[in-house]
């Protein structure tokens, strides 16, 4: 199965300026991400940058990159432009690997691409893993997803979901008392067909998307389906803040450790 990985890379992060270029063990973070993607089954890996500095940094390390406009409202909009610049056919499966995930598991990238290829009724594929602590379940920065019997997303929310009414009524808040099956944490990895990526920016934003600040809710709002791969493993940490960056640097440089990988 052939697919393309696109990595959106925007320099204007408010919490961590020039984030794609942050040094981790001697390499820009976006290069770490690209190398993980290149270890997957992707036929093509391209960084979609908004600044020539990112394009040049990628070129120095043998990573393909292209320059996109700076005024895109979302990463999906940036990838839609990249699909046009690369002249990808509408049927091409495109996996959106976030540029701040230097520990992304290549096998998880493959799993998302394969899932979408096997689910023609879905316009997107994504991933999740089981939540095993109440603190994570109640954390609004942890996005939860609920799926139907066919493994398709019913909804995403920052709120605890599904709400375990009887357990909470009984005061069962310890980690071992979470519902069975356990709630799922959404992993921000997406697979699309290029044709849908081109159509996505034309879909009107939804009220619930704005309330939750979750872009994927627009897809469900407009009646489309998202397939969800449930990974047995928790993904490695992403990088949003200076503290996150220090944590990943320690994993990759100081200790040489990495999170375990999903079996292919």
UniProtKB/Swiss-Prot annotation:
The gene is kdsB. One of its GO terms (biological process) is CMP-keto-3-deoxy-D-manno-octulosonic acid biosynthetic process. InterPro entries: Cytidylyl_trans, KdsB, Nucleotide-diphossugar_trans. Its main location: cytoplasm. PANTHER family: 3-DEOXY-MANNO-OCTULOSONATE CYTIDYLYLTRANSFERASE, 3-DEOXY-MANNO-OCTULOSONATE CYTIDYLYLTRANSFERASE, MITOCHONDRIAL. GO terms for cellular component: cytosol. This is 3-deoxy-manno-octulosonate cytidylyltransferase. SUPFAM superfamilies: Nucleotide-diphospho-sugar transferases (SSF53448). It comes from the Bacteria. It comes from Methylibium petroleiphilum (strain ATCC BAA-1232 / LMG 22953 / PM1). Keywords: Cytoplasm, Lipopolysaccharide biosynthesis, Nucleotidyltransferase, Transferase. Its EC number is 2.7.7.38. The keyword Cytoplasm applies. Belongs to the KdsB family. It is found in: Cytoplasm. HAMAP family: KdsB. The keyword Transcription does not apply. Pfam families: CTP_transf_3 (PF02348). Activates KDO (a required 8-carbon sugar) for incorporation into bacterial lipopolysaccharide in Gram-negative bacteria. GO terms for molecular function: 3-deoxy-manno-octulosonate cytidylyltransferase activity. The lineage of its organism: Bacteria, Pseudomonadati, Pseudomonadota, Betaproteobacteria, Burkholderiales.
């Amino acid at each position: 199965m052939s697919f393309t990985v696109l990595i959106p890379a925007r320099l204007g992060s408010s919490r961590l300026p020039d984030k794609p270029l942050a040094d981790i063990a001697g390499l820009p973070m976006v290069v770490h991400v690209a190398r993980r993607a290149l270890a997957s089954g992707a036929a093509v890996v391209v960084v979609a940058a908004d600044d020539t500095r990112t394009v040049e940094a990628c070129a120095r390390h043998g990573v393909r990159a292209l320059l996109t406009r700076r005024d895109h409202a979302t990463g999906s909009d940036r990838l839609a432009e990249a699909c046009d610049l690369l002249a990808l056919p509408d049927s091409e499966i495109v996996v959106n690997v976030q540029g701040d995930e230097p520990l992304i598991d290549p096998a998880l990238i493959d799993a998302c691409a394969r899932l979408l290829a096997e689910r023609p009724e879905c316009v997107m594929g994504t991933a999740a893993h089981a939540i095993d602590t109440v603190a994570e379940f109640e954390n609004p920065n942890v996005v939860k997803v609920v799926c139907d019997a066919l493994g398709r997303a019913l909804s995403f929310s920052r709120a605890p979901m599904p709400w375990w009414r009887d357990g909470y009524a009984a005061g069962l808040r310890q980690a071992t008392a979470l519902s069975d099956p356990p709630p799922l944490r959404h992993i921000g990895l997406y697979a699309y067909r290029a044709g849908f990526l081109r159509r996505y920016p034309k879909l009107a934003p939804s009220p619930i998307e704005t309330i939750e600040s979750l872009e994927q809710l627009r897809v469900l709002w407009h009646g489309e389906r998202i397939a969800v791969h449930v990974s047995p493993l928790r993904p490695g940490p992403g990088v949003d803040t200076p503290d996150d960056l220090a944590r990943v640097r320690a994993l990759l440089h100081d200790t040489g450790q990495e999170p375990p990988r999903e079996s292919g």
